[in-house]
Design a protein with these regions (language model features):
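Active-site bordering "gate/hinge" segments
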Residues: 1-42, 46-202
Length: 202
């Protein structure tokens, strides 16, 4: 097993100001365990008293070697791993992956499947943004905002469950189309969501 190397200021000298190197300002690590970063990044902050004068982001904490692991998988098994790249955007990750496969073999996708993909990826984007906004509110102690956002997100996850059998990690979008056609209740479920969501935003 590889040993972890000690991180020294020498690795960051070229990124921070002279004031930080002389001790006039303070360098502070925020994350990757800080409650407001949700474990996916580290921020090296340069502080002058209580004022942040510089911020160096380190976003490498989300990388889990998935790309390397996918090299040893069949294309069907590899797609399941795209759900885990960003669990808030599984449909978008599936789509990005299968679009490359389709381009590689010059595969045409039926118009209905293309439309379903767009609808589901856009719903996924809304659900992802609701988590973002809700957790921002939670970080500011706005519990109600968090609960409102998650209430709307639940309705979207219900639609995903209706379509794919899963609320998250759906692996629904497949090369050449989608896993299966949507059930008859799909249109009503989406229309019901679209009817209430604009009012709830206001």
């Amino acid at each position: 097993m590889a040993q972890l190397e000690e991180v020294s200021i020498d690795q960051y000298k070229h990124l921070v100001s002279e004031r930080a190197l002389t001790g006039e300002t303070m360098l502070l690590n925020m994350g990757p365990q800080h409650p407001s970063t949700h474990g996916v990044l580290r921020l090296l902050l340069e502080l002058d008293g209580e004022i942040v004068v510089n911020c160096i982001p380190d976003i490498g904490y989300l990388h889990t070697g998935i790309e390397k692991n996918m090299e040893a998988k069949t294309y069907q098994k590899a797609e399941v791993m795209t759900d885990r790249l960003d669990y808030m955007n599984t449909m978008g990750n599936n789509l990005s992956y299968v679009k490359k496969k389709e381009k590689l073999i010059d595969l045409d996708v039926p118009a209905r499947a293309q439309a379903l993909r767009v609808i589901l990826v856009e719903l996924q984007r809304i659900a992802s943004h609701l988590v973002l906004i809700g957790t921002w509110g939670l970080d500011l102690a706005a519990m109600s905002m968090f609960l409102y956002c998650f209430r709307e997100r639940e309705q979207i996850l219900d639609i995903f469950e209706l379509v794919s059998g899963q609320r998250m990690m759906t692996t629904y979008i497949r090369p050449g189309g989608v896993w299966r056609d949507v059930p008859v209740e799909f249109e009503k479920a989406v229309r019901d969501f679209l009817k209430i969501f604009p009012k709830r935003i206001d």
